[in-house]
């Protein structure tokens, strides 16, 4: 399966717009473009029962973040602090940058 074009990047602040974590915000830790999913810090936490191994000699129940579908998160604009859709703008020097569709502010610095 080909990698999907993602509207968010690592370290972006996002708000969950659908699902059990709806309305919560967090920072993106990982982007999985092959699956179209993102891992958001301290959201969608699941418990995994792990066996003892060389890394984790104790074993037991481990809590970790599970991936969310990228369509269920919206980028939070740093200027207006609202979840927003983004557009792409080409600057004078030819570089592409994302901008907020609500306040028209540049998101990438």
Swiss-Prot record:
Family matches, as CDD domains: KOW_RPL26 (cd06089)
Native source organism of the sequence: Syntrophotalea carbinolica (strain DSM 2380 / NBRC 103641 / GraBd1)
Protein name: Large ribosomal subunit protein uL24
GO biological process, alphabetically ordered: translation
GO MF terms held by the record: rRNA binding; structural constituent of ribosome
A GO term from the CC aspect: ribosome
Function: One of two assembly initiator proteins, it binds directly to the 5'-end of the 23S rRNA, where it nucleates assembly of the 50S subunit.
Entry's family note: Belongs to the universal ribosomal protein uL24 family.
One Pfam family hit: KOW
Organism taxonomic ancestry: Bacteria, Pseudomonadati, Thermodesulfobacteriota, Desulfuromonadia, Desulfuromonadales
Quaternary structure and partners: Part of the 50S ribosomal subunit.
InterPro entries (UniProt xref): KOW, Rib_uL2_dom2, Ribosomal_uL24, Ribosomal_uL24_CS, Ribosomal_uL24_KOW, Translation_prot_SH3-like_sf
UniProt KW keywords: Ribonucleoprotein, Ribosomal protein, RNA-binding, rRNA-binding
